[in-house]
Amino acid sequence: MSDTFKKFSYYHHSPSAVQKPLEIDLFQKLLKARGESFQFGSPVTIGRAVEDVASAVLVNGMDHKEALRHGTSGLDSHEAVPWEQGEMARLDLPRGDTLEAMSGYAIEAISQALSKANQIKGQERLDKKYAGIVLPFLGYSDFYGGNRVVELKVKTTAVSDSKAGRRAGSLPSKPDSNHATQVAFYADVLNCPATLVYVSEKGFKIFDETNCEELSTPGFANNLKELKARAWARENIMRCAPDTRTLMQMLSPNFQDWGWKMNPEHLEEARAIWGLNQS
């Protein structure tokens, strides 16, 4: 691999990260290269807990109740991150009946999507090199079986307030286009159809080639072209700068993007790159 990309701590393209604004992706890679720890908000923690429980049941054959006991360990250790303070100070991570409901819906939906599978496999590393792009793509699928890959997305609102209480995450009427583009890569590597499963504490929705054009073969082809175009463009941009700081200064940041929700010290460091922390 050329030092052109190593100097940015860029070793591969991710089907999800390549859809982020480049300046956010670069800064996160800079922090990771320094060994900085990342803080994740409660939705990420909840999503991981639901996936862990579903995987324990579907992949490892564990009893649901036993899987729930293991799944709550990550929730118990979660601490509210800085952007969940103030109005969001009363963090209410779902446990007990709520986590049981969400994970139960996940298990039901994934089982339905993979009804033809004799065996369900869990997270799998997937990589592929494409012509015209120097760096390979690397991603991790959630569930696979019966020649179909399933990506699980958990929709939840983890914050309670005195008036409304904690609200359930809303299920989408159609898949998020970024999610559809992400699974296009998995479908391409595994040469199989793909399904997107959305779960909340109120139910689930399943999207596949039968009810979503983006998850059809032509839809995957178009989304894969977009992924490769984004990767190709990033590599071209990285060839134009000597270091991460200079490259980031060539880009225009939008600090309203959720990707900038991070440790305040890290955010201040990022803003300084564009001189935005000066009085």
Task: Place the predicted regions along the sequence by residue.
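Short acidic (Asp/Glu) and glycine-rich catalytic loops that position anionic groups and cofactors
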Residues: Q28-R34, V154-T156, K202-D208
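Metal-dependent nuclease catalytic regions and adjoining charged, substrate-binding loops involved
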Residues: D188-S279
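Hydrophobic/aromatic-lined pockets within catalytic cores
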Residues: A54-M62, V154-T157, D188-N191
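An active-site-proximal "capping" alpha-helix that borders the catalytic cofactor pocket
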Residues: V50, H179-L190, A194
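Flexible, glycine- and charge-enriched loops at secondary-structure boundaries
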Residues: P43, P172-D176, T217-F220
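Metal-dependent nuclease catalytic cores that hydrolyze phosphodiester bonds in DNA/RNA
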Residues: M1-Y140, L276
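Short glycine/proline-enriched coil/turn segments at helix->beta-strand junctions
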Residues: D63, N118, G145-R148, V189-P193
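Non-catalytic protein-protein interaction segments used by genome-maintenance enzymes to assemble
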Residues: D127-Q182
